């Protein structure tokens, strides 16, 4: 059975049902946000941080194209588009010092310590690495948020932005599925948001099993998993059902 929104019949909105795993989910697109996580050169482009740190980014191009498709469909349906950029100030004060676990676990920070010539080039605000990939350009009405840690809810205004608009459903795309996407969706789950991941609009950091494990965790414990074609079909005008 489709899992409905807790307020599915309260606003007379246009509802749509998205086929997903482990079951379909029903939501109002105009009370839903599409979240694009960290589609920066750092994560999706050769020569960016992930590539320099030894992660494979050779298969990110189809993900970029799928995100373009999902963003277009979401914008047409009246969904809010939120873009995240992960990183810190040029001096990396926001990254935390040795007293922060981020200092010790961030592969970007470790890569720069191991290769001093990269200092100031990885995930620094204003750098090429920090910029969104050329193919993905926010439009007027979209929201672009910086974030200093893996979760988009930590030390950002995301929660208040969503609650002020009555948004309870979040559709996730981006990189990396097993790090920032999953971290943000998990935090959203704890804050009572319904999270859906479009699996072919995401990409893992690490081996393919990391993608599979993240999607298993999400569909089993924290949310729902679908794909871009199914999402676009659900948002087409013929899929809407008027809630009286």
Curated annotation (Swiss-Prot):
Highest taxon in the source lineage: Bacteria
Key words of the record: Hydrolase
Upregulating conditions: Up-regulated by the nitrogen regulatory protein C (NtrC also called GlnG) and repressed by RutR.
A GO BP entry: uracil catabolic process
Enzyme class: hydrolase
Pfam family, one: Isochorismatase
Active-site residues per Swiss-Prot or TrEMBL entry: 38 (proton acceptor), 147, 180 (nucleophile)
GO molecular function: hydrolase activity, acting on carbon-nitrogen (but not peptide) bonds, in linear amides
EC number: 3.5.1.110
Keyword check for Lyase: no
Catalytic activity: (Z)-3-ureidoacrylate + H2O + H(+) = (Z)-3-aminoacrylate + NH4(+) + CO2; (Z)-3-ureidoacrylate + H2O = (Z)-3-aminoacrylate + carbamate + H(+); (Z)-2-methylureidoacrylate + H2O + H(+) = (Z)-2-methylaminoacrylate + NH4(+) + CO2
Functional summary from the UniProt entry: Hydrolyzes ureidoacrylate to form aminoacrylate and carbamate. The carbamate hydrolyzes spontaneously, thereby releasing one of the nitrogen atoms of the pyrimidine ring as ammonia and one of its carbon atoms as CO2.
HAMAP family named among the record's database cross-references: RutB
Family: Belongs to the isochorismatase family. RutB subfamily.
Protein name as annotated: Ureidoacrylate amidohydrolase RutB
Species for this entry: Escherichia coli O1:K1 / APEC
């Amino acid at each position: 059975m489709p899992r409905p929104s807790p307020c599915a019949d309260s606003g007379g909105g246009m509802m749509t049902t998205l086929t997903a795993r482990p079951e379909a989910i029903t939501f109002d697109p105009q009370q839903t946000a599409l979240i694009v996580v960290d589609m920066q050169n750092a994560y999706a482009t050769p020569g960016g941080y992930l590539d320099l740190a030894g992660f494979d980014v050779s298969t990110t191009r189809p993900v970029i194209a799928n995100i373009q498709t999902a963003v277009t469909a979401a914008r047409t349906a009246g969904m809010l588009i939120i873009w995240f950029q992960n990183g810190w100030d040029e001096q990396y004060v926001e990254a935390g010092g040795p007293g922060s676990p981020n200092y010790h676990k961030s592969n970007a920070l470790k890569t720069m310590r191991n290769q001093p010539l990269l200092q100031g080039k990885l995930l620094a605000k204003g750098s090429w690495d920090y910029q969104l990939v050329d193919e993905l350009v926010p439009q007027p009405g979209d929201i672009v948020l910086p974030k200093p840690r893996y979760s988009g809810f930590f030390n950002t205004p995301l929660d208040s932005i969503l609650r002020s608009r009555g948004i309870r459903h979040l559709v996730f795309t981006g990189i990396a599925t097993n790090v920032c996407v999953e971290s943000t969706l998990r935090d959203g789950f704890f804050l009572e948001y319904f999270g859906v991941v479009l699996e072919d609009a995401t990409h893992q950091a690490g081996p393919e099993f990391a993608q599979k494990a993240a999607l298993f965790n999400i569909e089993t414990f924290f949310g729902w998993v679908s794909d871009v074609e199914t999402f676009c079909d659900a948002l087409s005008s013929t899929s809407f059902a008027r809630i009286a």
